[in-house]
Amino acid sequence: GGSIPCIETCVWTGCFLVPGCSCKSDKKCYLN
């Protein structure tokens, strides 16, 4: 759903620390 925040933040590289997280427009990673 993209509403659960992950610890990781992102700029260009995407999200890698937590599987299933994706980069959103606020430069933070959220669980899909």
From Swiss-Prot:
It comes from Gloeospermum pauciflorum. GO terms for biological process: defense response. Probably participates in a plant defense mechanism. This is a cyclic peptide. It holds the Pfam family Cyclotide. Coiled coil: none annotated. This is Cyclotide glopa A. InterPro entries: Cyclotide. There is a cross-link at residues 1-32 (Cyclopeptide (Gly-Asn)). The keyword Disulfide bond applies. Disulfide bonds join 6-21, 10-23, 15-29. The keyword Amino-acid biosynthesis does not apply. The presence of a 'disulfide through disulfide knot' structurally defines this protein as a knottin.
